Amino acid sequence: MAKTPVRTRKRVKKQVADGMAHIHASFNNTIVTLTDRQGNALSWATAGGSGFRGSRKSTPFAAQVAADRAGAVAKEFGLKNIEVFVKGPGPGRESAIRALNAAGFKITNITDVTPIPHNGCRPPKKRRV
């Protein structure tokens, strides 16, 4: 008996005009995630995944490239206006925001959501180089 062809529906890309950009800038890497208003991820990119390894991962240029890559994929969803949430003390904070602005997104708001302990865990010991 001949097999019947399996019918699959073509996945429809949802159109999202407003969204959020979450930038996690650590000392070692930068992660850029673009989401819709509910927080469902549309696209993401990292400095390490963009071809940078080792100490080059933690540069502002690597964060800029990661933001460009995430922005290019999010453009396909029709994303225009974004609200930026920045977390962490890393060197890629500023350059990732500038790259998203240069990619053609209208930034409506920038919020720093870096977690600050109210005298929580003991921090790591100081480095001796």
Curated annotation (Swiss-Prot):
Question: Which family does the UniProt entry place this protein in?
Answer: Belongs to the universal ribosomal protein uS11 family.
Q: What does this protein do?
A: Located on the platform of the 30S subunit, it bridges several disparate RNA helices of the 16S rRNA. Forms part of the Shine-Dalgarno cleft in the 70S ribosome.
Superkingdom of the organism of origin:
Bacteria
What is the name of the protein in this document? Small ribosomal subunit protein uS11
**One annotated Gene Ontology cellular component of this protein:** ribonucleoprotein complex
**What are its GO biological-process terms?**
translation
Q: Give the source species.
A: Colwellia psychrerythraea (strain 34H / ATCC BAA-681)
- Cross-referenced InterPro entries: Ribosomal_uS11, Ribosomal_uS11_bac-type, Ribosomal_uS11_CS, Ribosomal_uS11_sf
Q: Which GO terms describe its molecular function?
A: rRNA binding; structural constituent of ribosome
Pfam families per the UniProt record, alphabetical: Ribosomal_S11 (PF00411)
Q: How does it assemble?
A: Part of the 30S ribosomal subunit. Interacts with proteins S7 and S18. Binds to IF-3.
